C-alpha cells in the first residue's frame, strides 16, 4: 500500500527549483524569438505587414496580402506568394536589398520576402516560410576544408605566367551566368563595390556578382571599419534592419546588403535565399545604411553604404544565411607595396574572406584594381614583383617574376597568378591549408622590358672532362640594345668521344623540351610538400635557363629525373610486376642546370653541341 510522506522543507525547495528549471528549459525556444505562424496556418487573402529599411536606418512597414502557397517549388521547399504595397513598392516593384524582410500576420512572423519576377508591373514576391529558415540553425556541418579533387587546369605549367593564365581562363568559364526568363527568382542582392574604379567595377562585376546580385559602385560609411583588431562591443540588431555581408575590407570594400529576418539572442537569420550557397562559411557581418531606393524597370535597388563589423556569417544555405553577432570572421590579411620610382612607395592593406572559392577571385579583383589605380591601365608597363604566402603551419610559398607588355596585360598576369596560387593552396587534394598572410612587393616602370636571344658563344667547343667552359649569351632588348651575360660551368666526367648539349632558353621552351624528354603531358603533385615545391620552383620570365644534356639512360618518376639508376633497381621498377605509375624511361639525362636572373622578360632558345676530348 502506498502512502503519502511529507517532504522536508529542504527537499521541497530543491524539488521546486528542479521543476522551475525544467519548465524554463522547455519554453526557452518559444521565448527566444518572435512568435511564429507555421505555413499550415497561412491562407490566401490574409493580410499582414513587412519590415524593411528604405532610407537611413529607420525600419519601416509595408503591406502584405497573401495570394497563395507554391508547394514543392524546390525539393522539400515551399514559397508563399504575396502582393506588396506601400513605401512606394507600387512604383518600384520588389526592391533589390529587400531579401530577408520579415513578414508578419497577426503579430506572428510568417517568413521573409525572398523572391520576385523580373520586369513585373506589380510587387509580387515569394516568401520563404520561417520554419525552413529556422532549420539552418539546426544544421551541424563541419567547416569546408578546401580539400578537393586534382585541379584539371594544372597541366605541368612551365612558368608562373602560364599558371596565372590557366587560372584566368578557367575562372572566366566558371563565372559565366545563367539567364532567367519568367520564373520566380531570388531577389537580387546589392553588391557594393567601394574604392573600385569604374573600369575595375565593369571588369569584375560579372565574375563576382553572378545571378543573385545587383552590382553597385558605392562607398562605405564615413566612420567605417578599419583593420584595427580592437573591435567595439556589438550593437543590438532588430528584425527588418539592413545588414551587410562583407567579403573584402581595407582599402577596398566588397559588401552585399540584405535584411535581417529573425533575431534569436546573438544569432540572426537573413536574406531568405542563398548568398553563394557555399554551406559552412566565414564571412563578415556589418551594419548598413540605405541612402535611397533607385527605381528601375529591370530591378529597382537600394543604394547603400556599409558600416562597422558586428559579427560573422557562418552558414550560407538555400533558405538563407545564419549570422552570429559578436563573433568575427578569420580574414586573410594582404599587405601590398607598390613602388614606381626609387623613393615613392605606397602601402595598401586588404582583408579577404578565407574561402576556397571566393578568396582567389577576391584577390584577383583587389590586386588588379589597386595596381590599375596606381599605374597606367594602357600603354607600356613592366611589373617586377615578389610575393610570399605564409601558411598557418609555418611554410612559405615564395614567388618572384617580371611581367612586361602593354594594355593591362602585366597587371592581369600578376593578379591572376596570385589568385591561381591561392586557389591551388586552398583546394589541394592532400590536406587542409590555411593562408595566414599574403605579402606582395611590386616595382613598376612605364616601359617594356623584354629581350630576345641573339646567339650563344663558347670559349671552347671541345673540352676535357671536368674542364671549365665559359658561355657568352647575346640578347637584344626591346629598345634594340644588344646586351651580354656570361656563365661558367664545368663539364661532367664523361667518356672520351661522347657529346653533350648546352641548351640556353626561356622558361616556356624548357617545358616543351622536358615534355618531349619525359614523354608526359601533365604532372600532378603527389603530396602537399611536392605542391609547395612546385609552386615555389616554377620557372620565371626574367631568367635565362641553361641545361646540360647527355645521351645517358635514366628514369623520370613522380615529377623528378633519376639519372644513373643502378641496372638492378631499374629492372625492378620497370618490370610488369612493379606497375609503377607515372614512370618513364628516358634516353637523355640532365647533367646540370643553371639559371641567370636578368631584368627582362627573356625569349628564345639555342642548343650548342660540345665534344668531349679523347
Label the model's feature ranges.
Residues 1-11:
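N-terminal secretory signal peptides that target proteins for export/translocation
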Residues 13-14, 107:
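Short linear motifs in intrinsically disordered/low-complexity regions
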Residues 8, 14-15, 33:
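Compositionally biased, intrinsically disordered low-complexity segments enriched
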Residues 31-614:
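Terminal presequence/propeptide segments associated with secretion/organelle targeting
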Residues 15-29:
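Bacterial N-terminal signal peptides
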Amino acid at each position: 500500500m502506498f502512502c503519502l510522506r511529507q517532504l522536508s522543507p529542504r527537499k521541497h525547495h530543491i524539488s521546486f527549483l528542479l521543476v522551475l528549471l525544467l519548465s524554463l528549459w522547455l519554453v526557452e525556444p518559444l521565448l527566444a524569438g518572435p512568435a511564429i505562424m507555421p505555413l499550415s496556418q497561412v491562407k490566401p487573402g490574409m493580410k499582414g505587414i513587412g519590415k524593411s529599411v528604405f532610407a537611413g536606418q529607420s525600419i519601416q512597414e509595408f503591406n502584405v496580402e497573401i495570394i497563395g502557397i507554391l508547394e514543392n517549388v524546390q525539393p522539400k521547399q515551399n514559397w508563399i506568394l504575396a502582393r506588396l504595397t506601400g513605401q512606394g513598392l507600387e512604383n518600384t516593384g520588389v526592391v533589390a536589398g529587400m531579401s530577408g524582410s520579415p513578414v508578419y500576420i497577426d503579430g506572428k512572423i510568417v517568413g521573409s520576402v525572398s523572391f520576385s519576377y523580373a520586369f513585373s508591373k506589380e510587387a509580387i514576391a515569394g516568401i520563404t516560410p520561417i520554419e525552413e529558415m529556422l532549420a539552418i540553425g539546426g544544421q551541424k556541418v563541419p567547416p569546408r576544408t578546401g580539400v578537393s579533387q586534382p585541379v584539371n587546369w594544372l597541366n605541368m605549367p612551365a612558368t608562373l605566367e602560364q599558371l596565372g593564365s590557366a587560372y584566368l581562363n578557367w575562372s572566366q568559364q566558371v563565372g559565366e551566368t545563367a539567364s532567367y526568363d519568367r520564373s520566380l527568382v531570388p531577389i537580387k542582392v546589392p553588391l557594393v563595390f567601394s574604392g573600385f574604379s569604374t573600369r575595375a567595377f565593369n571588369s569584375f562585376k560579372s565574375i563576382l556578382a553572378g545571378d543573385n546580385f545587383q552590382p553597385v559602385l558605392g562607398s562605405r560609411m564615413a566612420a567605417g571599419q578599419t583593420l584595427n583588431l580592437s573591435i567595439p562591443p556589438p550593437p543590438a540588431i532588430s528584425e527588418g534592419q539592413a545588414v551587410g555581408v562583407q567579403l573584402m575590407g581595407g582599402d577596398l570594400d566588397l559588401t552585399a546588403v540584405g535584411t535581417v529576418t529573425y533575431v534569436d539572442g546573438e544569432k540572426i537569420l537573413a536574406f531568405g535565399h542563398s548568398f553563394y550557397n557555399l554551406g559552412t562559411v566565414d564571412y563578415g557581418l556589418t551594419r548598413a545604411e540605405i541612402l535611397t531606393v533607385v527605381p528601375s524597370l529591370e530591378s529597382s535597388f537600394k543604394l547603400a553604404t556599409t558600416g562597422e563589423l558586428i559579427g560573422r556569417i557562418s552558414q550560407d544555405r538555400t533558405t538563407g544565411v545564419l549570422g552570429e553577432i559578436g563573433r568575427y570572421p578569420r580574414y586573410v590579411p594582404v599587405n601590398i607595396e607598390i613602388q614606381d620610382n626609387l623613393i615613392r612607395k605606397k602601402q595598401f592593406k586588404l582583408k579577404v574572406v578565407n574561402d576556397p572559392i571566393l578568396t582567389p577571385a577576391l584577390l584577383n579583383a583587389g590586386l588588379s584594381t589597386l595596381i590599375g589605380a596606381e599605374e597606367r591601365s594602357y600603354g607600356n608597363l613592366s611589373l617586377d614583383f615578389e610575393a610570399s604566402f605564409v601558411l598557418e603551419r609555418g611554410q612559405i610559398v615564395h614567388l618572384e617574376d617580371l611581367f612586361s607588355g602593354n594594355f593591362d596585360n602585366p597587371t592581369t598576369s600578376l593578379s591572376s597568378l596570385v589568385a591561381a596560387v591561392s586557389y591551388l593552396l586552398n583546394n589541394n587534394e592532400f590536406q587542409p591549408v590555411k593562408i595566414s598572410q599574403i605579402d606582395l612587393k611590386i616595382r613598376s616602370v612605364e616601359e617594356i622590358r623584354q629581350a630576345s636571344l641573339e646567339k650563344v658563344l663558347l670559349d671552347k667547343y671541345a673540352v676535357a672532362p671536368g674542364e671549365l667552359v665559359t658561355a657568352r649569351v647575346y640578347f637584344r632588348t626591346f629598345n634594340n640594345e644588344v646586351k651580354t651575360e656570361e656563365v661558367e660551368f664545368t663539364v661532367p666526367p664523361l667518356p672520351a668521344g661522347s657529346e653533350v648539349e648546352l641548351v640556353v632558353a626561356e622558361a616556356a621552351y624548357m617545358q616543351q623540351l622536358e615534355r618531349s624528354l619525359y614523354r608526359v603531358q601533365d604532372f600532378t603533385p603527389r603530396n602537399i610538400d611536392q605542391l609547395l615545391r612546385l609552386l615555389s620552383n616554377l620557372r620565371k620570365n626574367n631568367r635565362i635557363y641553361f641545361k646540360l644534356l647527355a645521351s645517358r639512360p635514366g628514369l623520370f618518376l613522380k615529377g623528378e629525373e633519376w639519372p644513373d639508376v643502378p641496372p638492378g633497381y631499374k629492372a625492378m621498377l620497370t618490370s610488369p610486376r612493379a606497375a609503377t605509375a607515372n614512370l618513364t624511361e628516358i634516353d637523355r639525362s640532365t647533367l646540370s642546370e643553371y639559371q641567370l636572373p636578368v631584368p627582362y622578360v627573356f625569349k628564345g632558345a639555342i642548343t650548342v653541341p660540345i665534344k668531349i676530348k679523347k
